[in-house]
Regions:
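Short, low-complexity N-terminal intrinsically disordered segments enriched in polar/charged residues
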Residues: 2-31, 35-36, 121-159, 165-169
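Second-shell loop/turn segments in exported
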Residues: 19-24, 41-45, 89
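Short, structured motif recognition centered on aromatic/hydrophobic residues
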Residues: 21, 68-70, 81-85, 98-103, ...
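Short, well-ordered alpha-helical segments enriched in acidic and aromatic residues
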Residues: 27-48, 52-55
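Surface-exposed patches in mature extracellular/periplasmic domains of secreted proteins
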Residues: 30-33, 45-46, 69-73, 113-114
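Surface-exposed, charged secondary-structure patches
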Residues: 48, 56-96, 151-181, 201-208
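Short beta-strand edge/turn micro-motifs at domain boundaries
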Residues: 96-129, 185, 190-207
């Protein structure tokens, strides 16, 4: 266990962290792996937004885990925030859809803060993930994302709002999400290219 924790801490990139996460899902159990890599304030969807710490707290691992692999990774200039996406598969290896995970590095370790996904009929070709790094040219003013209304203390303790946002510390990568009343979800990622922000990921997840 100590060796596994040291390996997670030593992950050089969010792609490495994603791969370690996926390996651990097979080794120690799916929900155990989710708990291991989750940030304290990580968010999941069921389909409404829930705190991962509450959803995962007493959840037992299934007999067999799903599997997944990163296909694209969008990284901030300072390489401390990244958003990975790629296909995920049922325990018997059938394509089930795509995942999107937001990762942040703190204290030498990577933890995920957002985990979502949606249906997909075609998986990207297997191979090394494509990594897209934000520009480090010029100071990024902050991604063009509308912040959600502030939560009351009671709301913050119980459940996430139906929308949220986040941004890399250097401002070169930002994301936001919103859940509809029926459980549909919209997730966007903006990346700084040196002169402006471009929309690099736009997930429209239908209601279940």
């Amino acid at each position: 266990m100590i060796a596994a924790l040291l390996l997670a801490a030593a992950a050089a990139s969010a792609v490495d962290a994603e791969r370690a996460f996926a390996r651990d899902a097979q080794k120690i159990g799916m929900w155990s792996a989710f708990r291991k890599y989750a940030d304290r304030d990580a968010v999941m969807f069921t389909p409404q937004a829930v705190w991962a710490r509450d959803f995962l707290r007493d959840r037992k691992d299934p007999p067999k885990s799903i599997s997944w692999r990163p296909a694209q990774s969008y990284v901030s200039c300072d390489a401390r925030t990244a958003i990975n996406t790629g296909p995920w598969f049922t325990p018997d290896g059938k394509l089930a859809g795509y995942f999107t995970t937001v990762w942040q590095r703190s204290g030498g370790s990577w933890h995920w803060v957002y985990d979502g996904g949606g249906p997909n009929k075609v998986a990207p070709a297997a191979g090394p993930p494509k990594v897209y790094r934000a520009s480090c040219a010029r100071r990024a003013p902050g991604a063009p994302i509308i912040p959600p209304p502030p939560l009351t203390k009671s709301q913050a303790r119980t459940t996430p709002e139906d929308n949220g946002r986040g941004e890399a510390a250097d401002g070169t990568l930002g994301w936001d999400w919103k859940v509809g009343k029926k459980g549909d979800r919209h997730f966007r990622v903006y990346q700084w290219n040196g002169s402006r922000y471009t929309l690099v990921l736009n997930n429209l997840v239908p209601a279940p």
